[in-house]
């Protein structure tokens, strides 16, 4: 397609000097950078982004009610946003996942990781022959039909299920959606394989898209720390860390979560892998309260896994989140035997690795214990981070030896 045959997109004109982030290929335009919109654009519609002199910078999606006024689809002026565009992006992403799946023997992985795969607001996880779709931005929702058409072209044998039932959609004025898009309905629990483990995934009712694929490598790493150890698995969800700990030869693993449904699946996962169920305990409780109760009763563990949900959604919550992370890690440190291992994580994108490390250090000081950092974790390689979008590195973790 020649430039003269392109659709005439509305133009988002930036204020003078506010083009620097786009020149560095960052995919977001914030409200404070916007001078005006020239032409009319509906929510999520494609727009051209230009500097104050009219020089073309990028092509993106318009979101007038969001702090992020535009999310960039492409920095290539010759690229239109259509089915062919999404097909190219999908095939480019699949090349990397094919290599990973073959190398690690995976049947489930993140196929599209939003901005880092050039599709802002789009998350797609693959579980066997099911593609689970989350559209998290107005632009992604506006392009729903084109994206689904591209998915059907690239994956004709896969069923597509929509899990766009996340609260973040409300920030851009979108309703929550969930249900089958094409093909069969996922079973209530779908078995997948991960580094020798068989795990049941609840696509329809589970957290996010059903399972935390981003912690795959951290679950595997757990095995080298747990042989003959007593393990406490906090915020256990469906027991991926617990199964991995049992496969690593732990003496006992106690899994704690507030959801009985998740704990029931965790128990099934232990049984599915034919592991010793007598070594696994499942406790429905609030982790903060239980850790304090354990401290009062003198309970001790050799390894503690701390994988809490996101504590911070925006900058205004960061201080409170820091206190939460500090308190819970302090409690964990107090419960560890000398020489014990704390595997602790944060999935909050606003929490940098440096800040998280400082929080753990402060928690150790408050606990009156010395801590050595011995290993660092991040999201699995099917969740890549593009260099121009450091916000994509949201999951970070540390293995700490507590003296």
UniProtKB/Swiss-Prot annotation:
Entry-linked CDD domains: AdoMet_MTases, PUA_RlmI, RlmI_M_like
Keyword annotations of the record: Cytoplasm, Methyltransferase, RNA-binding, rRNA processing, S-adenosyl-L-methionine, Transferase
Gene3D superfamilies associated with the record: PUA domain, RNA methyltransferase domain (HRMD) like, Vaccinia Virus protein VP39
MF annotations from Gene Ontology: RNA binding; rRNA (cytosine) methyltransferase activity
Locations listed in the record: Cytoplasm
PROSITE patterns xrefs: PUA
Principal location class: cytoplasm
InterPro entries: PUA, PUA-like_sf, PUA_sf, RLMI, RlmI-like_PUA, SAM-dep_methyl-trfase, SAM-dependent_MTases_sf
GO cellular component: cytoplasm
Listed EC numbers: 2.1.1.191
Domain (PUA): residue spans on this chain: 9-88
Catalytic activity: cytidine(1962) in 23S rRNA + S-adenosyl-L-methionine = 5-methylcytidine(1962) in 23S rRNA + S-adenosyl-L-homocysteine + H(+)
UniProt function note: Specifically methylates the cytosine at position 1962 (m5C1962) of 23S rRNA.
Family assignment from sequence similarity: Belongs to the methyltransferase superfamily. RlmI family.
Family matches, as PANTHER family: RIBOSOMAL RNA LARGE SUBUNIT METHYLTRANSFERASE, S-ADENOSYLMETHIONINE-DEPENDENT METHYLTRANSFERASE DOMAIN-CONTAINING PROTEIN
UniProt-recorded name of the protein: Ribosomal RNA large subunit methyltransferase I
Gene from which the chain derives: rlmI
